[in-house]
């Protein structure tokens, strides 16, 4: 793995996961195939979330309430990602409400958001905001920002696991057209997710909250893998995004409870 190749993958990951402007040269002569690129997802997640963490710290420093600052931070995250993961979360929630596999996949292709999708977004955003506001009571503003960055890396690593662990549910779907992460891609993503979490979270909390967060988010990803495999027979672009959201929500809630 050369540094230049990894920087290219990081830039492509940022372009794939966010609305950040990325130079077109990183996509020239690239087929769009994603067997290697997701290894940089954890670092991309950290970069994407850093502005939201800094906004949270700034607003708290200027006297904003924890709830207002948390809402603003989550709102900026959504803007920076173009609600990519939230869209997948809502579509997956709607789809899993379907009576069978075929109906579920049809529902997930529908651009309209149903009742389950709306409820998933309400509860998902609400839990993230509440957990962030709770963290403010235990940590300094800048330390909460660091926790956000670490969790962003972990949740992106676990979405790579979901992508790698399951076959495509639809042979003509977006996930199938992009290819599947290689074994080394998964191992690198998991290592980077863990490394970023250790560097950002361990120094500002302790080993116990970090361990609780890692175990809880890993268990959430495992449960997501099993549920999606059972109901849909494989992953889609929507379930990959949903797994990221499930893991982020679980990570924020678990570390807030552990502190």
UniProtKB/Swiss-Prot annotation:
<feature type="transmembrane region" description="Helical">
    <location>
        <begin position="64"/>
        <end position="84"/>
    </location>
</feature>
<comment type="similarity">
    <text>Belongs to the CobS family.</text>
</comment>
<comment type="function">
    <text>Joins adenosylcobinamide-GDP and alpha-ribazole to generate adenosylcobalamin (Ado-cobalamin). Also synthesizes adenosylcobalamin 5'-phosphate from adenosylcobinamide-GDP and alpha-ribazole 5'-phosphate.</text>
</comment>
<dbReference type="Pfam" id="PF02654">
    <property type="entry name" value="CobS"/>
</dbReference>
<protein>
    <recommendedName>
        <fullName>Adenosylcobinamide-GDP ribazoletransferase</fullName>
        <ecNumber>2.7.8.26</ecNumber>
    </recommendedName>
</protein>
<keyword id="KW-0169">Cobalamin biosynthesis</keyword>
<dbReference type="GO" id="GO:0009236">
    <property type="term" value="P:cobalamin biosynthetic process"/>
</dbReference>
<dbReference type="GO" id="GO:0051073">
    <property type="term" value="F:adenosylcobinamide-GDP ribazoletransferase activity"/>
</dbReference>
<keyword id="KW-1133">Transmembrane helix</keyword>
<comment type="pathway">
    <text>Cofactor biosynthesis; adenosylcobalamin biosynthesis; adenosylcobalamin from cob(II)yrinate a,c-diamide: step 7/7.</text>
</comment>
<feature type="transmembrane region" description="Helical">
    <location>
        <begin position="43"/>
        <end position="63"/>
    </location>
</feature>
<dbReference type="GO" id="GO:0005886">
    <property type="term" value="C:plasma membrane"/>
</dbReference>
<feature type="transmembrane region" description="Helical">
    <location>
        <begin position="141"/>
        <end position="161"/>
    </location>
</feature>
<keyword id="KW-0997">Cell inner membrane</keyword>
<keyword id="KW-0472">Membrane</keyword>
<feature type="transmembrane region" description="Helical">
    <location>
        <begin position="116"/>
        <end position="136"/>
    </location>
</feature>
<keyword id="KW-1003">Cell membrane</keyword>
<keyword id="KW-0812">Transmembrane</keyword>
<keyword id="KW-0460">Magnesium</keyword>
<keyword id="KW-0808">Transferase</keyword>
<dbReference type="InterPro" id="IPR003805">
    <property type="entry name" value="CobS"/>
</dbReference>
<dbReference type="GO" id="GO:0008818">
    <property type="term" value="F:cobalamin 5'-phosphate synthase activity"/>
</dbReference>
<feature type="transmembrane region" description="Helical">
    <location>
        <begin position="185"/>
        <end position="205"/>
    </location>
</feature>
């Amino acid at each position: 793995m050369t540094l230049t190749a990894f920087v290219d993958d990081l830039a492509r990951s940022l372009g794939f996961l966010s609305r950040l402007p990325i130079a077109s040269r990183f996509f020239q002569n690239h087929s769009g195939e994603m067997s290697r690129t997701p290894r940089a997802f954890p670092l991309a997640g950290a970069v994407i979330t850093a502005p939201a963490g800094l906004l949270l710290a700034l607003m708290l420093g200027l006297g904003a309430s924890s709830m207002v600052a948390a809402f603003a931070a989550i709102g900026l995250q959504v803007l920076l990602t173009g609600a990519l993961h939230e869209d997948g979360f809502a579509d997956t929630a709607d789809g899993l409400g379907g009576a069978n596999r075929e109906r579920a996949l049809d529902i997930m292709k529908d651009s309209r958001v149903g009742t389950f999708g709306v409820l998933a977004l309400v509860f998902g955003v609400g839990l993230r905001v509440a957990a962030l506001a709770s963290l403010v009571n235990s940590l300094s503003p800048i330390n909460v920002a660091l926790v956000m960055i670490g969790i962003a890396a972990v949740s992106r690593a676990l979405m790579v696991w979901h992508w790698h662990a399951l076959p495509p549910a639809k042979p003509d779907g977006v996930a199938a057209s992009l290819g599947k992460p290689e074994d080394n891609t998964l191992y690198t993503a998991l290592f980077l997710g863990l490394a970023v979490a250790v560097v950002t979270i361990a120094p500002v909390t302790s080993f116990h909250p970090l361990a609780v967060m890692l175990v809880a988010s890993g268990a959430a990803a495992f449960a997501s893998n099993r549920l999606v495999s059972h109901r849909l027979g494989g992953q889609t672009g929507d379930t990959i995004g949903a797994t990221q959201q499930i893991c982020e929500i679980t990570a924020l809630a678990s570390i807030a409870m552990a502190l």
